[in-house]
Structure formats: structure tokens, C-alpha cells
């Protein structure tokens, strides 16, 4: 019997941890794709890691609940997340792709507090 593989290879996890920006791909209820650049942090848990991203207090033209990525996740929680490095020397190009279910975390919950703490640690303001 073979051992189960981790959801993300340790080398890929290190690559993700070293970067500051990723791209989150979602799809709406009809399957139309949308991709946005995001800031993110990882939270380690006993079964693996969780990628968290803020729906922050920057001025927006809509309430955060009406953001396309939020509506898409509510309709179809399966997402893709990619972190990459571009180099003029194409032999040095690198990227890691993670796929899985996303969920929205409501403010004033322990999970929200944990996410905010992880994001503040990675992106001190």
C-alpha cells in the first residue's frame, strides 16, 4: 500500500510561502471564468494548510458580498489558485497550481480572526 500524497508537495508549499501575490480563479454559475490577483497567507492545520485572502476595507464600488469572486464562490466553490515567477530566461519560469473548494468566512468568527492575524503577519502595514 502506498502512503497518501499531501495535498501540496513540501517544495511547492515553500514556493507558495516565499511569494507575495497569487491569482485566484473562480467561475460563475454558468461556468464563465474570472481571475483576480490576490494577497494571501497560509494557515497550517493538522490536515494541511489553508490559503486565506482578505476582502479588505479598501474603497470599493460595491459591498464585499457583491464582489464577483464572492458571488462566484457562493455559486461554485471549486477554485484554482496559482503562484508564479516570471523570468526572461524561460528555463527559470516556475509556478504552482492548487485546486480545491473555497469558503467564505464571516467577520467576528474565530476563523476570521485567525485569517486576519496571518495576513497581518505576512503583510505588515
Q: Language-model segments: what does each one mean?
A:
Residues 20-65, 81-85:
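Short beta-strand segments
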Residues 12-13, 67-70, 116:
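Short amphipathic alpha-helical segments and helix-helix/interface helices
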Residues 1-7, 64, 80, 86-125:
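Charged, gly/pro-rich active-site loop segments
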Amino acid at each position: 500500500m502506498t502512503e497518501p500524497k499531501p495535498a501540496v508537495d513540501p517544495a511547492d508549499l515553500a514556493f507558495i510561502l516565499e511569494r507575495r501575490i497569487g491569482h485566484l480563479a473562480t467561475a460563475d454559475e454558468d461556468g464563465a471564468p474570472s481571475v483576480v490577483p490576490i494577497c494571501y497567507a497560509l494557515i497550517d492545520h493538522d490536515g494541511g494548510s489553508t490559503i486565506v485572502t482578505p476582502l479588505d476595507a479598501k474603497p470599493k464600488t460595491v459591498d464585499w458580498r457583491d464582489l464577483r469572486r464572492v458571488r462566484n464562490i457562493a455559486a461554485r466553490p471549486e477554485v484554482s489558485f496559482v503562484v508564479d515567477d516570471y523570468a526572461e530566461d524561460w528555463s527559470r519560469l516556475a509556478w504552482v497550481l492548487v485546486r480545491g473548494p473555497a469558503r467564505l468566512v464571516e467577520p467576528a468568527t474565530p476563523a476570521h480572526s485567525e485569517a486576519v492575524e496571518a495576513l497581518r503577519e505576512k503583510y505588515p502595514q
